[in-house]
Regions:
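Conserved lysine of the Walker
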Residues: 95
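P-loop NTPase "switch/coupling" elements that transmit nucleotide state to mechanical/effector output
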Residues: 1-90, 100-272
């Protein structure tokens, strides 16, 4: 692989929202990109800097973030490597917007699609470039959420009203897998995006003091790629996992509507 480490961290600074500009708030952190040094952020209060693999400022688009930090992972997944993109941050930080795991981001014509719909387009571009006479491919997608320590299948037809028998297990080789989840075979980007849109609509959301439509669950979208080569009688499997972690903040800060402090505590325990 091009990158030398298995885990890389990107920091994204979102723009100020109207409530913050009305209060004359300013950014505490600023991007700092010195020559011949890793990208950094500058903490204005104490002038300290912290280095990351990628730093994106408030003006940077989803397109720039995707091309810099995510596109290489999708190419590696196409070549047989497993890859995960994990969005983590406080409620209202812009995780769902960045990941594109909100319903609006998966709809056709979305003005600023997030990582998930961009990854779908990119993956199909790569797969469609294969020589159909020498190699075939198959894609399957699953979409889960974890809410209050319950795992829900967002692609289950009755996911919003019925509990599904889903368990997380470990096989003999030490690999973690999810038993009982529905995997949908998809043959086109439109079919895959339709699955994701249905899953987004089923996600658990709630209004908070920090975000009117906050995702109150952790979501995990898994795209399983299978490439078959009849010439060499070989098959390559890989998985692209796209995780939108629900907001990380105290109940007093978020003021989550319809949730008790116990609900919020359980929500945080589900990360582990």
């Amino acid at each position: 692989m091009e990158q030398q480490t298995s885990v890389r961290v990107a920091l994204r600074l979102r723009p100020l929202v109207k409530k913050e500009t009305d209060l004359n708030d300013t950014h505490t952190l600023e991007p700092h990109n010195p020559p011949d040094a890793p990208p950094q952020v500058l903490v204005n209060t104490d002038k300290r800097t912290y280095a990351y693999d990628y730093v994106f400022g408030p003006q940077d688009t989803n397109a720039k973030l995707y091309e810099s930090a995510v596109a290489p992972l999708v190419r590696h997944c196409f070549n047989g490597y497993n890859a995960t993109v994990f969005a983590y941050g406080q409620t209202g930080a812009g995780k769902t917007y960045t990941m594109g795991s909100g319903a609006a981001s998966t709809e056709p014509g979305a003005t600023e699609p997030g990582i998930i719909p961009r990854a779908v387009d990119h993956l199909f571009e790569l797969l469609e470039s294969l020589d159909a006479d020498s190699e075939q491919y198959a894609l399957h997608v699953s979409y889960l959420e974890i809410h209050n320590e319950e795992v829900r299948d967002l692609l289950h037809p009755a996911a919003s009203s019925a509990k599904t028998n889903i368990t997380i297990r470990e096989d003999a080789a030490g690999d973690i897998f999810v038993h009982g989840v529905r995997e949908v075979a998809v043959g086109s980007r439109e079919a895959l995006l339709a699955c994701l849109e249905a899953g987004c609509d089923a996600r658990t959301t709630a209004s908070t003091l920090m975000n009117e439509y906050s995702s109150r669950s952790h979501s995990l979208c898994t795209i399983r790629v299978q490439r078959n080569s009849p010439e060499t009688a070989s098959t390559v499997f890989s998985k692209l996992r796209l995780v939108d972690h629900a907001g990380s903040a105290r109940a007093k800060t978020t003021g989550t509507a319809g949730q008790s402090p116990t609900d919020t505590a359980t929500h945080h325990q589900a990360r582990h």
